[in-house]
């Protein structure tokens, strides 16, 4: 019985040893498999990361793709929209050949990015009496601390003395009627900005303009572009050239002020069709002709940038009012 008991103990011990060895071998295989799998996963992720890095590099390499995020409708649109971040305006040199003729013209376009800064300023002596008088554009600019100034509405030239004192038709300044002289032959229309800073072209009275929210306006014409439609597509119409002035606005709100020198060696002048075509090229949605001829003038910081011509008179023409860009 003792021998049997001893044998049983030995067998039990051997059994435990075999079980322990089996567990150890099984666990070791599992550990090896786990380590192997982990290595394979690590290698796979490294390969994937390498591929992702290659793809990302190809996407963000602007030089390789030659990608330009800013798109323009045409070269004129690019000329308007290319500017420094803090630039309130820019001046573009304009030159070309008249439509239907072979006359060279030159001038300037002022591009104003904030339409709320575009206002009407008047001569200190403008009024509706015989002793009213105008001022040259540079003086109007100085008196109103303007960055840019351009002649605006016409005037009644009594006795052909060019004193520029009595404005033609309604003049509205800061939402109020400044003058509204009617002689009976007014043939233009309102050219002005409303309180939403949109250029409005409409034949209406001064009172109607105030009722429709016009803040600054003069009376003149003809209208060049109305709601995107060029009014002078017929090249045989109004081909007479001289100094010209116009104002327009793009759909994005940018204001365009345009002057073309006339009756001079460097610039014969432009027609209404030319002015409409220039405004159309630069994206004007609405645009109108203003007083031109010897009145055509533009200043930058009170200095003339175009070449005003006043016939054979010694002085630059006096004006009743001007479109200005405030500081």
Regions found by a protein language model. Name each.
Residues 2-182:
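Zymogen propeptides
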Residues 104-109, 187-188, 241-246, 320:
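Short glycine-rich loop/turn motifs
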Residues 111, 147-151, 191-192, 200, ...:
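Structural recognition of the beta-strand scaffold that forms the well-ordered cores
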Residues 115-117, 155, 206, 262-264, ...:
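Short, glycine-/Ser/Thr-/acidic-enriched flexible segments
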Residues 116, 197-199, 253, 294:
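Structural signal for glycine-centered tight turns and loop->strand junctions in beta-sheet-rich domains
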Residues 124-129, 205-209, 260-264:
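Short, solvent-exposed aromatic-acidic interface loops
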Residues 155-236:
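Active-site-adjacent helix-turn-beta-strand microarchitecture at beta-sheet edges
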Residues 160-181, 233-285, 290, 295-327:
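Conserved, well-ordered active-site substructure
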């Amino acid at each position: 019985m003792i021998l049997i008991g001893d044998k049983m103990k030995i067998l039990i011990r051997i059994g435990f040893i075999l079980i322990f060895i089996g567990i150890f071998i099984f666990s070791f295989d599992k550990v090896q498999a786990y380590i192997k799998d982990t290595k394979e996963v690590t290698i796979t992720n490294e390969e994937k990361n390498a591929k992702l890095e290659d793809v990302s590099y190809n996407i963000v390499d602007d030089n390789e793709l030659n990608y330009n995020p800013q798109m323009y409708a045409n070269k004129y649109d690019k000329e308007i929209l290319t500017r420094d971040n803090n630039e309130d305006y820019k001046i573009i040199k304009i030159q070309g050949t008249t439509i239907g003729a072979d006359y060279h013209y030159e001038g300037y376009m002022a591009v104003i990015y904030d339409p709320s800064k575009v206002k009407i300023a008047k001569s200190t002596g403008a009024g509706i009496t015989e002793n009213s008088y105008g001022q040259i554009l540079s003086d109007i600019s100085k008196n109103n601390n303007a960055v840019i100034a351009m002649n605006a509405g016409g005037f009644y030239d009594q006795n052909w003395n060019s004193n520029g004192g009595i404005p033609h038709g309604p003049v509205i300044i800061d939402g109020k009627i400044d003058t509204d002289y009617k002689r009976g032959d007014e043939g233009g229309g309102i050219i002005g900005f409303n309180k939403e800073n949109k250029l409005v072209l409409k034949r209406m009275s001064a009172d109607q303009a105030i009722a429709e929210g016009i803040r600054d306006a003069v009376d003149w014409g003809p209208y060049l572009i109305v709601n995107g439609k060029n009014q002078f597509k017929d090249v045989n119409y109004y081909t007479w050239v001289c100094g010209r002035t116009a104002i327009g606005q793009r759909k994005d709100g940018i204001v365009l002020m345009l002057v073309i020198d006339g009756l001079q060696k460097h610039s014969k002048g432009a027609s209404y069709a030319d002015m409409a075509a220039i405004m159309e090229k630069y994206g004007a949605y609405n645009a109108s002709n203003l007083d031109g001829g010897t009145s055509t003038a533009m200043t930058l910081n009170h200095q003339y940038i175009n070449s005003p011509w006043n016939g054979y008179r010694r002085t630059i023409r006096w004006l009743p009012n001007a479109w200005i860009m405030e500081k």
